[in-house]
From Swiss-Prot:
It comes from the Bacteria. The keyword Ribosomal protein applies. GO terms for molecular function: structural constituent of ribosome. Coiled coil: none annotated. GO terms for biological process: translation. Belongs to the bacterial ribosomal protein bL28 family. This is Large ribosomal subunit protein bL28. The keyword 4Fe-4S does not apply. GO terms for cellular component: cytosolic large ribosomal subunit.
Length: 99
């Protein structure tokens, strides 16, 4: 299981621990990943994602999972998120055709 946010693509970063004597040792900065179920308003169901806390804030800032997926470019999303996005677009097209 990789340590990458499924919605934002945020992953691990490499840096240094720096001592008082300015000695540098390699270290890794990991994103704060949480397993969450995000609800889709248009599909009326929940989807499980492994998301960073920054990603959760971004989703809420954009008005929910549906708006976030529609605004985000495909290359930033995981395969799981892309499946949900395709399903969402399909449901929206069917709703437009029925109306």
């Amino acid at each position: 299981m990789s340590r990458i946010c499924e919605l934002t693509g945020k992953g691990r970063q490499v840096g240094h621990n720096v001592s008082h004597a300015n000695n540098k040792t390699k270290r890794v900065f990991l994103p704060n990943l949480q397993n969450v179920t995000l609800l889709s308003e248009k599909l009326d169901r929940g989807f499980k994602f492994r998301v960073s806390t920054q990603g959760l804030r971004s989703v809420e800032h954009n008005g929910g999972l549906d708006n976030w997926l529609l605004k985000t470019k495909d290359d930033k999303l995981s395969s799981n998120a892309l499946k949900v996005k395709r399903e969402l677009k399909k449901a929206m097209n069917e709703a437009d055709a029925a109306a």
